[in-house]
């Protein structure tokens, strides 16, 4: 990169840092999306009040080792699990709200698919990553870019606290993560523009 504002003798060489290089070297990764719509294909998370009950979520034959063994077989070096997508259903027993695996029959409400996924990744030498949608939550009637809509059971401040709690849980309870993936844009409020 050469800038016309620099002396012709002065050049800037941009190189990736160590973490950027590690990510580039991983080359092949997989994303695993396992959410409430797997069990309810007609479910539309934007239709507030129609979310499926956690009692219908019971992947009794789930095998995260099979997921990660398959990923390793295709040459993947990392895998990303969608821990919470737009439905708002959480694949770990979050303390932030009730729409999660803790209120499902899966492992009698004691299951934690995020923990199972991370353990499988470590077992097979695959670097674990987590995807979390913070800008949409059908259960709480929140839509991009993270705005609480009219009729929501929570205020914007309460939703922001829920997001903070869930992100703290995800980044604190599962050890070192290779990738953290956010989707859906950023809220461009006056606070963030200043």
Give residue ranges: language-model regions.
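Mature catalytic domains of secreted/periplasmic carbohydrate-active enzymes
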Residues: 5-194
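Bacterial N-terminal signal peptides
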Residues: 1-3
């Amino acid at each position: 990169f050469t800038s016309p504002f620099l002396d012709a003798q002065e050049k800037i060489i941009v190189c990736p840092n160590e973490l950027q290089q590690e990510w580039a070297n991983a080359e092949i990764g997989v994303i695993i999306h396992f959410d409430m719509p797997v069990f309810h294909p007609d479910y539309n998370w934007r239709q507030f009040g129609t979310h499926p009950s956690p009692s219908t979520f019971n992947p009794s034959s789930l095998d995260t080792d099979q997921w990660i063994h398959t990923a390793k077989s295709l040459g993947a070096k990392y895998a990303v699990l969608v821990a919470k997508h737009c439905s708002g259903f959480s694949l770990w027993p979050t303390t932030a709200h009730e729409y999660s695996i803790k209120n499902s029959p899966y492992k009698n409400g004691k299951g934690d698919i995020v923990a199972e996924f991370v353990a499988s990744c470590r077992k097979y030498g695959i670097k674990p990553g987590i995807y979390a949608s913070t800008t949409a939550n059908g259960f709480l009637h929140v839509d991009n870019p993270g705005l609480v809509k009219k009729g929501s059971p929570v205020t914007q401040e309460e939703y922001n606290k829920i997001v903070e709690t869930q992100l703290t849980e995800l980044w604190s309870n599962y050890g070192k993560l290779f990738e953290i993936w956010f989707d859906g844009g950023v809220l461009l409020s006056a606070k963030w523009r200043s």
